[in-house]
Amino acid sequence: MSKNSVKDKAKSATANKTIALNKRARHEYHIEERFEAGLALQGWEVKSIRAGRGNIIDAYAYVKQGEIFLIGAQITPLIQASTHVVANDRRERKLLLHRSEIDKLVGKVERDGYTIVPTAMYWSKNKIKLEVALAKGKQTHDKRDAAKDRDWAIEKQRVMRRGNRDA
């Protein structure tokens, strides 16, 4: 086995770890802090996620009786899923976090007007993990400013490339 094939395998292994991304979260929220949380899933949900049927774009988390639950995440059941289990693709799922992390999130959400938003779903040691972020909503003008900054960064790169070609 050559060195290149080992590098290619490593790259493909890291690329396969991401199940779903929530790009909308970065656009609509100021992300303050990120946490890694486990998910309490049923067997058919894990099978569906392995088949690439997970979606977290419209999802958010909320606090209920000192625990944090994910709602709005869609895990579409497989066609060959078992019929004796009623598959609800948008059911609320419990997030598994340490008590200190839960307390920190609860304090910020209840007092400071933050929200808990999932940003990514990925594999970690054969377990499905969810990256949740403590975030504050952006105003419309904040979104426009972010778009301007992004456009300016792209334009700067173009100018720099043109300048390097001429030299």
From Swiss-Prot:
GO molecular function: RNA binding
Function, in words: Required for rescue of stalled ribosomes mediated by trans-translation. Binds to transfer-messenger RNA (tmRNA), required for stable association of tmRNA with ribosomes. tmRNA and SmpB together mimic tRNA shape, replacing the anticodon stem-loop with SmpB. tmRNA is encoded by the ssrA gene; the 2 termini fold to resemble tRNA(Ala) and it encodes a 'tag peptide', a short internal open reading frame. During trans-translation Ala-aminoacylated tmRNA acts like a tRNA, entering the A-site of stalled ribosomes, displacing the stalled mRNA.
Gene (name only): smpB
InterPro entries tied to this protein: SmpB (IPR023620), SsrA-bd_prot (IPR000037), SsrA-bd_prot_CS (IPR020081)
GO cellular component: cytosol
Protein's name in the database: SsrA-binding protein
Subcellular location: Cytoplasm
Family under the similarity heading: Belongs to the SmpB family.
Keywords from the UniProt entry: Cytoplasm, RNA-binding
Main location: cytoplasm
Record-level GO BP terms: trans-translation
